[in-house]
Amino acid sequence: MTITPQNLIALLPLLIVGLTVVVVMLSIAWRRNHFLNATLSVIGLNAALVSLWFVGQAGAMDVTPLMRVDGFAMLYTGLVLLASLATCTFAYPWLEGYNDNKDEFYLLVLIAALGGILLANANHLASLFLGIELISLPLFGLVGYAFRQKRSLEASIKYTILSAAASSFLLFGMALVYAQSGDLSFVALGKNLGDGMLNEPLLLAGFGLMIVGLGFKLSLVPFHLWTPDVYQGAPAPVSTFLATASKIAIFGVVMRLFLYAPVGDSEAIRVVLAIIAFASIIFGNLMALSQTNIKRLLGYSSISHLGYLLVALIALQTGEMSMEAVGVYLAGYLFSSLGAFGVVSLMSSPYRGPDADSLFSYRGLFWHRPILAAVMTVMMLSLAGIPMTLGFIGKFYVLAVGVQTHLWWLVGAVVVGSAIGLYYYLRVAVSLYLHAPEQPGRDAPSNWQYSAGGIVVLISALLVLVLGVWPQPLISIVRLAMPLM
């Protein structure tokens, strides 16, 4: 197969991030300079974001049998790049107080971003697996980056071992699917499934094992047990990446698989997914109720958010409405999570041992950092799905899709889950306005709003509010990103 200039333009984000990895690697080898390597990483990610405009001009195309570049791939690539960019900006002040090697952090984030972009473009089970491994392997190192703390090291070991087990399930599932259908590309799988092959036991077993592997990566119940521990143990900027880029990229590729290969047409698979969605929504919210650690709380809340998204995935037969729901919901989830984890990162910067993640650290924050407290409040309201925030628009879409496809008990679960979620999100928001303790523990720097991380947090808050009141620009972008079959 010959690679044309058009193909190269379509792969620009991937090539730019790949080139940035090489440049940062050479820069580290030449001379360790934290500021220089952080700047190079941010420039590379920004250049990749800008290149999406040129990709859009080139139009949709298949680049090699493994990848398809279209509006859908561009939307998810953009979201992954934004999350990676935010991770780098939050990491810079955090690493300022870190005594070991700082520069490799950016290298690992860039490699993980590469995996995310590959997943967004994947059109084949081989590229799906490659992308998942490319995003997971750097995360093993990132989660354990604060390795002098027992908790970070423990989180890294836990995530590594469980992730390896999940990958083996995924790979074995793919092997069974290949044994039955003789093909691994999404489109060919779709054709085979259309020929009434979906009820073959081998194929069902294969897809079942793949659901186990992907369920782990998306932290869906009952494959979620690693989530709160890893979120708590990982450095705050890494938790940001875990909660956003990795989830968004993997959910995007699952969405494309379900679009091309209508796996959801099988009654057995639909029932299994519905049970997983129901359990994730209810369990994630119930477990978050008792948490006094903000990172653990956000970990459990991410389980419930993926449960809500699964409702839209099950309702994929409604076509465009369901895909629109996922796009809008993921954008809202991205900005809300970036803001919430960004505040935790700012409070924990520079690195001085464990992060400022206990609820007590935020008590009375309003009285000495009013803007930061306001940002955190907006993020909590958005995650809870309160009207006038972007989180509400996403949740409304999910409910509309559920009602349209008559998934009544899942719609009920979304409503009950949102009601439970309201309690623990408001608990965090209210504690920001209580009397400050006599001896405040950790605090954000006084000039936090002038730092790159502070600007990212403020922009996230602004987007959550503006798009919550006027979501049309976001909806238009998501509509442009419908994959052309």
From Swiss-Prot:
Localization of this protein: Cell inner membrane
Catalytically driven reaction(s): a quinone + NADH + 5 H(+)(in) = a quinol + NAD(+) + 4 H(+)(out)
One BP annotation, GO: ATP synthesis coupled electron transport
Membrane topology annotation: Multi-pass membrane protein
Keywords per UniProt: Cell inner membrane, Cell membrane, Membrane, NAD, Quinone, Translocase, Transmembrane, Transmembrane helix, Transport, Ubiquinone
Main subcellular localisation: membrane
Pfam families documented for this protein: Proton_antipo_M
UniProt function note: NDH-1 shuttles electrons from NADH, via FMN and iron-sulfur (Fe-S) centers, to quinones in the respiratory chain. The immediate electron acceptor for the enzyme in this species is believed to be ubiquinone. Couples the redox reaction to proton translocation (for every two electrons transferred, four hydrogen ions are translocated across the cytoplasmic membrane), and thus conserves the redox energy in a proton gradient.
Alphabetized PANTHER family for the sequence: NADH DEHYDROGENASE
Subunit structure: NDH-1 is composed of 13 different subunits. Subunits NuoA, H, J, K, L, M, N constitute the membrane sector of the complex.
Protein name, entry field: NADH-quinone oxidoreductase subunit N
Gene: nuoN
